[in-house]
Every structure is written in C-alpha cells, then in structure tokens.
C-alpha cells in the first residue's frame, strides 16, 4: 500500500472545516428550535392556527355576554386548548423528541375533528335558540370562521405527504 502524498506546500482549499454545531445542551436545542419551526411559521400553518384560535376566543367572549348552553362553552374551550397545544408543539419543536407519534397525521386529524366539532356546535347553537340576538349570531359566525380556518389548515397539512413513499412489506 502506498504512503500518503506529502505536499511541500499547502494544497488549495485548506483543511476541511469541522462541524460547529453544538452536540448537546441549550445551544443545540436553540439551534434546532430555530431551524425546525421555520416551516411551521412560513408555510401558513401558524397563520391559520392563530386565526382559528382568535376566532374561537372571540366567539367564547361573545357567548359569555349571553347565557348559552354549557356544551357550547365546553366545546369552544376544548378546541381552543387543543389548538394551543399544537401551536406550542410546533413552535417549541417538541415533536422532534417524541418520534413514535406521526405528528403531521395527528395534526390533520386534529384539524378535521376541530372543523367537524365547530360545525356541529354551530348547528347545536342554531337549534338551541329560537331568537338569535346579535352577540349570539356573531359568536356563531366566528365559530364558522374558525371551522373554515381549521379546514384550510388541514389542506395545508397535506404537503407533508407529497414526497412520502409507502413501504412495501
């Protein structure tokens, strides 16, 4: 086997650079946080999740001025809490540390069920009252806007599956 070539001069290109990313600790987590949530904020998921959350909170505020059925309050609070969970999950990059859950599929199902529950809540709110005062009607419209934002967010989630190939067993 031949000995490696020794150059009398320094070859062009210099030494290969070492990987400067931190291997552990807070600096590594902050770097991963910066890199991992760019897609969430720039692809439109965050905008529609925040719009949906804002509509749900506004609808809850309008419902609180009246005396609605307690199921409507419970429904909106539950959907808002789940929406906040997914916003924190994607913003803090926690989904990288829990690999046994396929998070894009969980987010699609969350958006689908949120759309269905909010639509059912609108139907229930409409059937629960004969007279629809202005704050009650406004809250129903805001619930509809939140359902539409959840549906659009569900459609945006399908981008995760474009390049995905199924395994053949």
Curated annotation (Swiss-Prot):
Location relative to the cell: Membrane
Domain of life the protein comes from: Eukaryota
Annotated GO biological process: chemotaxis; negative regulation of DNA-templated transcription; regulation of testosterone biosynthetic process
GO molecular function, one term: transcription corepressor activity
Membrane topology qualifier: Multi-pass membrane protein
PROSITE patterns in UniProt: MARVEL
InterPro entries in alphabetical order: Marvel
One cellular component (GO) term of this entry: cytoplasm
Residue intervals of the MARVEL domain: 40-162
Main location as per UniProt: membrane
Transmembrane segments: 40-60, 69-89, 98-118, 136-156
Keywords of the record: Chemotaxis, Cytokine, Membrane, Transmembrane, Transmembrane helix
UniProt similarity note: Belongs to the chemokine-like factor family.
Protein name (database record): CKLF-like MARVEL transmembrane domain-containing protein 2A
Source species of the chain: Mus musculus (Mouse)
